[in-house]
Curated annotation (Swiss-Prot):
Pfam families: TGT (PF01702). Keywords: Cytoplasm, Metal-binding, tRNA processing, Zinc. It is found in: Cytoplasm. Zn(2+) binds at C325, C327, C330, H356. Its cofactor is Zn(2+). InterPro entries: QTRTD1, Queuine_tRNA-ribosyltrfase, TGT-like_sf, tRNA_ribo_trans-like. It comes from Drosophila erecta (Fruit fly). GO terms for biological process: tRNA-guanine transglycosylation. GO terms for molecular function: metal ion binding; tRNA-guanosine(34) queuine transglycosylase activity. It comes from the Eukaryota. The keyword Hydrolase does not apply. Non-catalytic subunit of the queuine tRNA-ribosyltransferase (TGT) that catalyzes the base-exchange of a guanine (G) residue with queuine (Q) at position 34 (anticodon wobble position) in tRNAs with GU(N) anticodons (tRNA-Asp, -Asn, -His and -Tyr), resulting in the hypermodified nucleoside queuosine (7-(((4,5-cis-dihydroxy-2-cyclopenten-1-yl)amino)methyl)-7-deazaguanosine). This is Queuine tRNA-ribosyltransferase accessory subunit 2. Belongs to the queuine tRNA-ribosyltransferase family. QTRT2 subfamily.
Length: 418
């Protein structure tokens, strides 16, 4: 994996180019990973995604917690000359990164042991050791994979829990650094330590002590427990820790921060020097019946961050979900129709919502890259912060409780998981 910086600005972060493998496409950073569940982009078939969302190669974010049951099948697939991990899930031509936890769902706390990390899957809790993890990575053969780490920390974690997370991560990574040569994939060094600057420094020091070429980038973990918790983070606590960490890292390696961070938080993190994020925020919005409507184009109109499709007020609103949007959903359908699909539990409902939300979020990142190139990120941040209003907009996502009836729900919309 090769990473080159095009420009760095004190006010707008940095613009870069990322080439994950030789012969692969050059990707502009700040970059958006496409979050998947069980190897698929939620609710979207490969044909729908590639026909109506993006015709360009993307980086797919696979998670072990939703794909661990595929290990044996992937071993046979790759040994038989299969077309890689992306090809196995029906998305050939796209790059991929393998992570441990699903950023879309709240990760349960506890279950930590000295030599294993708990992996919460559909079948319950599995025990994951460093040895087992590397065996699974060898079976998956991803383009990039994160190092195994104890990320069971958040803002409320005690110092003892934070220190244990750092110590256990160092132990996991000691084995992984020794055996990484057996896997032809790029390793990301995990940086853990909760909201403790001393612990974060210790984690960074351990990574930077490794021989040159041991890893290709950094992944920050342990700020939240995934799912909707990432949308409610206190940035006044988060940003100083990120700034503290970034100052200690070399500039020629990408920095990844997974989680459903809000658009405003993402802009502030980009200014701090973070390069790669994921689309779990768009999924969380779709799961909770919200269409993203925040504006990132300068105009004189006041905007709102979401359209709640459960709202009875839109049942006779025959305008597009977002009038300026060019996605399939907004070009072909109306707010009233989305509300009707919600009320009738139709599978098409979440499909159309996800098409719009992913399209809108990808366009947002296009605008981010243009703003960074022009050193105009502060202006974009101000627009996203207030949406041309007088007060700061709230981008946090609350679990939607207006489910009609769990007993009668079909395979479309599902009850939102907290």
């Amino acid at each position: 994996m090769k990473f080159a910086i095009e420009s760095i600005s004190k006010n707008s972060g940095r613009l870069g180019q990322l080439r994950i493998k030789d012969g692969g496409p050059e990707l502009k950073t700040p970059l958006l990973l496409q979050t998947t569940k069980g190897g698929s982009i939620p609710w979207l078939s490969a044909d729908v995604f590639e026909s109506h969302v993006s015709q360009k190669p993307q980086v797919l974010q696979f998670t072990l917690s939703t794909m661990d049951q595929m290990t044996e099948a992937l071993t046979h697939w790759n040994s038989g000359g299969g077309n890689g991990l992306s090809g196995y899930v029906g998305l050939p031509g796209h790059l991929n990164i393998l992570m441990v936890r699903d950023p879309c769902e709240t990760t349960l706390s506890g279950g930590n042991d000295r030599d294993i990390m708990p992996l919460f899957t559909r079948r319950g809790k599995e025990s994951l050791s460093s040895e087992r993890y590397m065996e699974m990575v060898a079976s998956f053969k991803p383009d990039i994979y994160q190092g195994l780490c104890d990320a069971d920390t958040n803002l409320d974690s005690a110092k003892k829990r934070i220190q244990k997370s750092v110590d256990r991560t160092e132990k996991f990574m000691h084995y992984i650094y020794e055996h990484r040569c057996k896997v032809n994939s790029t390793l990301l060094a995990p940086i853990v330590g909760g909201y403790n600057t001393f612990a974060r420094t210790q984690s960074i020091k351990h990574a930077r002590e490794q021989p040159a070429g041991s890893y290709g980038g950094y992944i920050f973990e342990g700020f939240h427990t995934n799912g909707l918790t990432a949308t409610t983070l206190d940035t006044s606590k988060l940003l100083p820790i990120v700034e503290h960490c970034v100052k200690q890292l070399e500039e020629d390696k990408p920095r990844i921060l997974p989680g459903a961070y809000t658009p405003l938080t993402i802009l502030e993190l980009i200014r701090q020097g973070i390069d790669v994020f994921d689309s779990s925020y768009a999924y969380c919005a779709s799961l909770n019946f919200k269409a993203l409507t925040f504006s990132f184009v300068q105009d004189a109109v006041e905007h709102v961050p979401f359209l709640d499709i459960t709202d009875e007020a839109i049942k006779e609103d025959f305008t597009p979900p977002l009038s300026e949007c060019s996605c399939l959903t907004c070009q072909k359908h109306t707010r009233a129709y989305l509300h009707h699909l919600y009320k009738t539990n139709e599978l098409l409902g979440p499909i159309l919502l996800m098409v719009h939300n992913i399209h809108h979020y990808m366009a947002f990142f296009e605008e981010i890259r243009e703003s960074v190139a022009k050193d105009a990120l502060p202006q974009l941040t101000e627009l996203v912060r207030n949406q041309n209003g007088k007060t700061q907009v709230d981008y946090s996502i609350a679990a939607n409780n207006k489910v009609i009836s769990k007993a009668t729900m079909g395979k479309g919309f599902a009850a939102a998981a907290v």
